[in-house]
């Protein structure tokens, strides 16, 4: 009933938005897109009319044309990989209009972020960000979201073999990093355990965006470490005339990898529909030491969406289904595999360029039904289910008293249950609600943003345990400074954020044998919330020959929650009375004596570090690039290292780029990680070599990209410090990958 009412509200909200140009006479808008450095036509560029949400690609000669454009004032943008995104104002009358556009080559800050209240270029973001799309996404594409992103500054990969993987941002993992799909939470259980993966095929993504550092203001308390947004556009929000889409096919030699993904939008200018699907399969992969048994995986997805698109508003819905299966290597009891299934239903409405004080709005409703079973051979050991409903409304107002901003509300209902041998928790209902405010004030050479968010979360567990409530405030203030003499080619970005996170469900209630984390885990229902105070400082520069960013950060967190190992005697002294907790009998430290007891504790901690990325243009075609990141985490009272911190890392690369051709390589240099906690095993440093070539061309208004990559070209034997199986398994050996993408 709640879902039906919310869906109806979204529909009414959308159709209530007026369309000012609906009855006006229509004409054409056409022009030529050229490259600023040489005046050559720009083929395959995406030209977008913001207010009408219309888009088209340029032909081989750089020309574009829109039909049926009502009279009015519009902002027209050009998006092309490797070029600065430009927006130009144009006035369209009753006769055909012409607008020629010029794009400038951009080495690094070429994309626009959608994760902020109002989309803004990377160069002008308050926090460090990363964006992968187009040719760059093809160059980085792997079988998981985490593996695809792991070469970006500040991002590492938590793994449990090859399939279960999740991004780690600045050393923060699990419930501190939010993964969303088209702005909505994925509804899976990858944050809870290392053997649970993110149920998204990265080949099906149109783009990926990452925010490094607290993103709690807009995305909730769980984004205290950062945010990953996977954009697939299952609900069309732009007017679509005819058809547009993307197809990706990839194959790899290691593990006999293969897969494909595609999505198509078709429409008549008023109604638009989305059809999408993907599939991938990987056999047992090989390391320099040989093949890894039971390391296979497969993924299949399907999605269907539709929307009504007006002149200034839209409303639509989509349905998606994900079916996965992957093996867990190195389990002595026999072959263990997981079979995640996820149903997702979304309703979304939005409007922009509206008359009145509210100039735009966005309303979303997402329903997720997730379940996976842990299979021991053909027998079901444990079944986990997670049902989730999430809703959000954001209203953005026109400038008033110098302020431009947004106000919004958010709610979440989650029902978690585990049944079987590893039923670590009683069934738990989680209800969260929040309200937030975000404002900006701008001057010629500076912009200030500030905002606040109030979150309330209630956990209601079964099993006779008491309900637990948390109410916390998060706030942030940030500044962008553009020195006048720099002509907008140098920016100083600074932000100070107070973020609060209530304990996660697993930190409060887990109790029992958990093979996914190689532990016997002991939750603590009395844990207090984490409260962090984080500071970010970023320096960004761009010019004809160099573009780059250096960022420094520090995060002081009170009551930092982590898994602390304890002895058998400590367990007996502190937890012996809970032997029948949740109707699950304990079995000591595991019958084989191989599982360590871990209890969730909270202690004050500090994390600090630095990130840098730069591109240097030696000549018109030869470009060097470098990436560096480091993070340190310590407990304040003892100065001990925090567990599972990524090692220092540097990447050096060189590429040749001429029009649509890129050929290059890079060396990934990772330091020894011996700053460990307790009995955590250290890892040696290593260097891996990566070679690639990519070519993009336009034919018949279709953009083709072919990418070849040789990963770990020297077949280096190395271990990922954040892989829970690192003591038993090195990482994947030499792999050749071929990726073909088609956009139209």
Segments from the language model and where they lie:
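Flexible loop and strand-edge segments within Gram-negative outer membrane beta-barrel domains
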Residues: 282-283, 288-289, 293-299, 313-388, ...
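Gram-negative outer-membrane beta-barrel transporters
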Residues: 403-405, 445-449, 554-556, 581-673, ...
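Short acidic/polar hinge/loop motifs at secondary-structure boundaries
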Residues: 185-214
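Outer membrane beta-barrel strand-and-loop segments of large Gram-negative receptors
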Residues: 305, 382-395, 434-436, 528, ...
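Conserved C-terminal beta-signal and adjacent last beta-strands/turns
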Residues: 300, 307-310, 352, 490-494, ...
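Short, acidic, small-residue-rich periplasmic hinge/interaction motif at the N-terminus
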Residues: 34, 50, 79-83, 93-138, ...
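Surface-exposed extracellular loop regions of Gram-negative outer-membrane beta-barrel proteins
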Residues: 323, 332, 369, 415, ...
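Outer-membrane beta-barrel translocator/receptor signature
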Residues: 204-207, 212, 217-288, 295-301, ...
